[in-house]
Amino acid sequence: MGFVRDEDLEWGPEGIEERIREGLLGYHDMPPLGVGRVVPEEYFERFGGVFPESVLYIWRRFGFVGFGQGRSWITDPVEWAPVVDAWLEGIEVPFPPQRWHCVTRTALGYMRLWGEISGPALKVDVIDGTIRPSSSVAGDMADPVLAERIGCITFTSPLEDLYDDEVSGRPVAVEGIERLGVPGAAEVFGFVPPLSFGGRISGDRLSVQKAVPYLVGLAQSTPRYLGVDLMAAWGGAATQFLIDQGAIPNSTGTSDGPSAPDTVGDPDNQDGPGGSGGPAGSGGFGGGL
């Protein structure tokens, strides 16, 4: 199919390599663990019409591998399909019916899901059961150039766990790595017992678990719910404030409420290169997406 090119935005191999250097390896300081598992050639045929070329390029570049001592991973969407099915079962997401794939995840199992229509518009927090949509990402996927950008940023602004140890204040995933070692490609750190049964977030409660069966079981024991679309909510509040101040006319809203701001293809509008607060941004897989 080939990369989509635009005179102002080019997301070919050179641009992706720059993002890898400046974002993934530079700003985020997340080098790969080593040589990743090679992505099977049939995956490029299966997903060639699903993911933009930027995603397929990164697959060829890295394979399925972990970054930053296993804090973030590029996942095999076929192997992780049972996990996705378990976490989305019974949840009505605000997007057209489509197949969802896990493309990145963290040491604790926090997942980014890519819809075959809506792109990487869902994040799943397996700790608190939140499935969080992003309508701004889904809307940008209609633009082929922005879709290439979204694909690039999804992998070069890596997803990270958001939870800190309630005693030490340090990232609980980092404490898990220090105590248990780097998790493998088929492993996650899980709380024992799961936090859905109560207790504090503490690194000494973590153990190494087989990722797929553990997360499928966790989906069955953890209350799951659709979270707030933060960018849409923020955009609506910001627009209403401007209307109240008389800065913009009320006609800028629609019958469904004020429109959200344009995030120009950033999966999270996060800090980091390409995000709103990063050195290359206009203001990622970062949890920071």
Locate each region found by the language model.
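A surface-exposed partner-binding patch
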Residues: 2-122, 189-257
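Compact, glycine/acidic-enriched structural inserts
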Residues: 122-165
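Mixed-charge (acidic/basic) macromolecular-recognition segments
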Residues: 147-212, 216
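Long, low-complexity, intrinsically disordered segments
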Residues: 263-289
